């Protein structure tokens, strides 16, 4: 724990928003020499497997961000026949039941559904006995987010906040981390009731975006987007892309009807996961 504190302490002191803005600027630079340098060194440092990428040649990307949110070859992530599939590549931070409206962040640390979603008590009450899974995407992972189940898009809330790192050491130290960081809460209806996918920002995450909105503009104010009448077809099918991170972060998946979700028994905190693999069955 002492090492975790030492790693985390500087984050309280550095200008996280300024550093993130600067990183975002360089990630969008289209100068061939600079962007190729950034991409080449990132691949080397994190051992990125470019054979899975739809565009394998690193020099073919216009900028670092285009490389970072690269598409994969469909055959590299076949979709299982499971009722609920994993929406990302990454690892499980925590998974389990929402207890009296509280989600486990790390050992001994909790935060509430209401804090995470920045919503009223009536909405939070729907998830008070639900199920949740927190999925961490490391820098080397594929950074597009897909649908775990067929769902109807209802609304979206942009919630401004801090930009702490979401690496495991930070989650063990910073209280209510996921309810403090900038995030995007996306609300859906499914055949088993309400579902929310929360895309959590972090230090040097240049942008969070969705397939229907594009990059969500960073703001100091909470913003709500109502899609109840905006789209003629709001159903997004299982496995379809729904969003992306321009640099890595975390997805928190919540189901309101906890009695209907039975997580795969092999999924524990620390487990590696991959897009399309079985995640849960509906009982």
Swiss-Prot record:
Keyword line: Cell membrane, Decarboxylase, Lipid biosynthesis, Lipid metabolism, Lyase, Membrane, Phospholipid biosynthesis, Phospholipid metabolism, Pyruvate, Zymogen
Keyword presence, Repeat: no
Membrane topology: Peripheral membrane protein
Residues at the active site: 89 (charge relay system), 146 (charge relay system), 249 (charge relay system), 249 (schiff-base intermediate with substrate)
Family under the similarity heading: Belongs to the phosphatidylserine decarboxylase family. PSD-B subfamily. Prokaryotic type I sub-subfamily.
Localization (cell): Cell membrane
GO biological process: phosphatidylethanolamine biosynthetic process
Protein name: Phosphatidylserine decarboxylase proenzyme
Gene name tied to this protein: psd
Note accompanying the cofactor annotation: Binds 1 pyruvoyl group covalently per subunit.
Top-rank taxon, per record: Bacteria
GO terms for cellular component: plasma membrane
InterPro entries per UniProt: PS_Dcarbxylase, PSD-B, PSD_type1_pro
Record-annotated site: Cleavage (non-hydrolytic): 248-249
Cofactor(s) demanded: pyruvate
Gene Ontology molecular functions: phosphatidylserine decarboxylase activity
Subunit field text: Heterodimer of a large membrane-associated beta subunit and a small pyruvoyl-containing alpha subunit.
Catalytic activity: a 1,2-diacyl-sn-glycero-3-phospho-L-serine + H(+) = a 1,2-diacyl-sn-glycero-3-phosphoethanolamine + CO2
Role played: Catalyzes the formation of phosphatidylethanolamine (PtdEtn) from phosphatidylserine (PtdSer).
Source lineage: Bacteria, Pseudomonadati, Pseudomonadota, Gammaproteobacteria, Legionellales
The protein's Enzyme Commission number: 4.1.1.65
Post-translational modification: Is synthesized initially as an inactive proenzyme. Formation of the active enzyme involves a self-maturation process in which the active site pyruvoyl group is generated from an internal serine residue via an autocatalytic post-translational modification. Two non-identical subunits are generated from the proenzyme in this reaction, and the pyruvate is formed at the N-terminus of the alpha chain, which is derived from the carboxyl end of the proenzyme.
Pathway: Phospholipid metabolism; phosphatidylethanolamine biosynthesis; phosphatidylethanolamine from CDP-diacylglycerol: step 2/2
Pfam families attached to this UniProt entry: PS_Dcarbxylase
Positions of post-translational Pyruvic acid (Ser) modification: 249
């Amino acid at each position: 724990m002492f090492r975790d504190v030492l790693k985390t302490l500087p984050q309280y002191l550095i200008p996280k928003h300024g550093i993130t803005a600067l990183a975002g600027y360089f990630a969008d630079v289209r100068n061939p020499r600079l962007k190729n340098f950034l991409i080449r060194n990132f691949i080397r440092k994190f051992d990125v497997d470019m054979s899975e990428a739809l565009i394998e040649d690193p020099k073919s990307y216009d900028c670092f961000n285009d490389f970072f949110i690269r598409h994969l070859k469909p055959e590299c992530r076949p979709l299982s026949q499971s009722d609920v599939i994993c929406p990302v590549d990454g690892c499980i931070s925590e998974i389990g039941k929402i207890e009296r409206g509280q989600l486990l962040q790390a050992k001994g640390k909790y935060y509430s559904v209401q804090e995470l979603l920045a919503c009223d008590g009536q909405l939070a009450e729907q998830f008070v006995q639900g199920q949740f899974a927190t999925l961490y995407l490391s820098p080397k992972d594929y950074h597009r987010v897909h649908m775990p189940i067929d769902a109807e898009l209802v609304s979206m809330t942009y919630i401004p906040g801090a930009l702490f790192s979401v690496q495991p050491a930070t989650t063990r130290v910073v209280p209510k981390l996921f309810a403090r960081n900038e995030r995007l809460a996306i609300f859906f209806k499914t055949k088993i009731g309400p579902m929310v996918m929360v895309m959590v920002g972090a230090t040097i995450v240049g942008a969070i975006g969705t397939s229907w909105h594009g990059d969500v503009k960073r703001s100091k104010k909470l913003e709500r987007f109502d899609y109840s009448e905006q789209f003629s077809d709001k159903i997004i099918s299982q496995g379809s892309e729904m969003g992306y991170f321009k640099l890595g972060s975390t997805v928190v998946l919540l189901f309101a009807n906890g009695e209907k979700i039975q997580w795969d028994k092999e999924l524990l905190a620390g487990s590696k996961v991959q897009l399309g693999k079985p995640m849960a069955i509906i009982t």
